[in-house]
């Protein structure tokens, strides 16, 4: 059936071409004065016959080419075709607008005024198709998130509340850490929790590691995500998109946060700094943990157990129950003992808190 359609197209096309070109051929052959030959019907018939003969050789190639295109389109996923076509249409519209803005009539050579529109249509159409095809995952995710946010809007107060609850994008370190599940359970973290697909893939790689410690950490992270999804009353979204031009997961998180105006949730000190430099909102759960620790002021007294040497000469190291490190000056001689110390200073950073103290017995001796 397709073969006959192609042959019919060749014949019709040949007839049309014959009407316009065969009379010119008759003029060159100097037989334009013969009425029986030089008429539209004869010209159309000659053109149709010529293209019919061409179709005997060329039909198979055309049919095979059409079938190849058909098979390729049928095998392609619907989102690929949809967003590729949208990108193509958008590119052609841009090309049309540009052609109408540029005064092509002022171009000195006529051939350029003819070629430029064709080139722009081809180039921008191809570019639009490629962008729509390769960015389909990101566009789908953004549209789904946008649609979900629109459904939640009602009154003006509700709209303001939804805008305040930005998307919380989790990174790998905060998932493995595990405290994020408890924070979500207490209700301190509002809004929608977004877990990017590339973070899940990184967790999967860690869980499949040959190193026992890494494997346990990866499996713990997957268990934490399972708990957040199934046990906690909080909305969780999986972001299916990816940024193929970016290799690092941290850089992908920053890019996603920029696209969605979301907040990166992490306990990675370096990622925290990168987000600040990129003007991306970030929540560091170490900052939250430090904020809820008991406040310790210089001059306060506490009882600690010195457990090991410090980095400097005669220093000892102790820890509070919450894991805060205490550096005890002249504390090396008290390793393994419980002693009373006086706080001399407190160093607070995004990575944690460190307390400097000295033995109370030493203070009394002075």
Swiss-Prot record:
This is Uncharacterized PIN and TRAM-domain containing protein YacL. The lineage of its organism: Bacteria, Bacillati, Bacillota, Bacilli, Bacillales. It comes from Bacillus subtilis (strain 168). Residues 295-356 form the TRAM domain. PANTHER family: AAA FAMILY ATPASE (PTHR11603), MEMBRANE PROTEIN (PTHR11603:SF147). Mg(2+) binds at residue 250. Residues 169-280 form the PINc domain. The gene is yacL. The keyword Cell division does not apply. PROSITE patterns: TRAM. Its cofactor is Mg(2+). Pfam families: PIN. InterPro entries: Nucleic_acid_metab_PIN/TRAM, PIN-like_dom_sf, PIN_dom, TRAM_dom. One of its GO terms (molecular function) is metal ion binding. Its EC number is 3.1.-.-. Belongs to the ycf81 family. In the central section; belongs to the PINc/VapC protein family. An RNase. Keywords: Hydrolase, Magnesium, Metal-binding, Nuclease. Induction: Transcribed under partial control of SigM ECF sigma factor.
